[in-house]
Amino acid sequence: MAAILLDVDGVLHVSGEPIPGAVEAVARLRVEGHRLRFVTNNSTRSRAALVEELRGMGHELEDADLQTTPIAAAEQLGGRRVYALVMAAIVPDLTGIELVGDSADAVLVGGCDETVEPNQVFSYMNLARAFSEIQAGADLFALHRNPWWQTARGPMLDGGAFVAALEYATGVEATVIGKPSAASFAAALAALDAEPELTWMVTDDLEQDVRGAQLFGMKTLLLRTGKFRPDALERSSTVPDAVLSSIAQVPDWINRTL
């Protein structure tokens, strides 16, 4: 049986609206004995809230089945003084991190949501403070570096754009905690006790997830849902193992490869 990493936003749902056939496909993969791990770069809601949302759609999973960037950040930055540009909802998941307004030894940048909160989190003054902290020697960390994500209203600017701005202004490269970092993929495979060459990454994100998974030695399935753009695929040097219409086709595809 295969080990499968499932992206969430754009694969299972878009803005909370389930992708047709997603619940049935995931359930079938479980019944057929495949090992599944949900891996998301969503950094605007707690893991508990994200799990509850998926359960509400009909998915069966435990909290530990969902790998999130705030939980990973807490493990990586625990005990450090951190100036964090993040949504308030994820603060409970940053257990062990000392959140400070100045004299930080690390700056952490999260993602955006569809509310007005990013207007405050990523204000000029907050970005300027992050710039100053990095200039003073703080390390720069990003929960992810996605420049945008797909919503029901269309593409929306994401936190990766602000990460790039801070990198440009400071000359400091961010350490990425979520996908496509090697650490993120390594943690996911360790949870499944899986080898990269026997693992599939299922996603709608060509440049972050597909490219990153391939560099880590995994096989990849790109779905034509969520943020998928045909023109981006045509222009890209990244070639997934297969392009499927949606997650509904994944069980049949995986089974044919075994």
Each language-model region and where it sits:
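Asp-based, Mg2+/Mn2+-dependent phosphohydrolase catalytic module
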Residues: 2-8, 13-23, 27-34, 43-67, ...
